[in-house]
């Protein structure tokens, strides 16, 4: 079994996308959430179908013809490095940001559509 230092070293070498997948796997395996307590309370209320949705995932469905502009916009919006942003755009359809407030999600959608991307809020 790996010791704590080996695990930390392995995590240091991961990309942001790999870290995101790791967090999701840990959440599923142990039945926990990495969200802040306020966000977790909102997520618990999200199970009610009649409740208004307050958090949205922004999904890039297509980069369109201006792929370079879309990569730059994704890089700015996510804080990813250029390589990771390009991989995310190349892998479309992909969720760019999760659990965003409606207003922020709509702003990001508008920014990405301005540079030619196709985006959906889920």
UniProtKB/Swiss-Prot annotation:
PANTHER family to which the protein is assigned, alphabetical: 39S RIBOSOMAL PROTEIN L12, LARGE RIBOSOMAL SUBUNIT PROTEIN BL12M
RNA-binding in keyword set: no
Record-stated family: Belongs to the bacterial ribosomal protein bL12 family.
GO molecular function, one term: mRNA binding
One record GO biological process: translation
Known role: Forms part of the ribosomal stalk which helps the ribosome interact with GTP-bound translation factors. Is thus essential for accurate translation.
Signal peptide extent: none
Gene3D superfamilies on file: 3.30.1390.10, Single helix bin
Cellular component aspect of the GO annotation: cytosolic large ribosomal subunit
Upper classification of the organism: Bacteria, Bacillati, Bacillota, Bacilli, Bacillales
Name of protein: Large ribosomal subunit protein bL12
Chain's gene name: rplL
Source organism, top-level taxon: Bacteria
Keyword Signal: no
Entries under CDD domains matching the protein: Ribosomal_L7_L12 (cd00387)
Keyword tags: Ribonucleoprotein, Ribosomal protein
Organism: Staphylococcus epidermidis (strain ATCC 35984 / DSM 28319 / BCRC 17069 / CCUG 31568 / BM 3577 / RP62A)
Subunit structure, as described in the record: Homodimer. Part of the ribosomal stalk of the 50S ribosomal subunit. Forms a multimeric L10(L12)X complex, where L10 forms an elongated spine to which 2 to 4 L12 dimers bind in a sequential fashion. Binds GTP-bound translation factors.
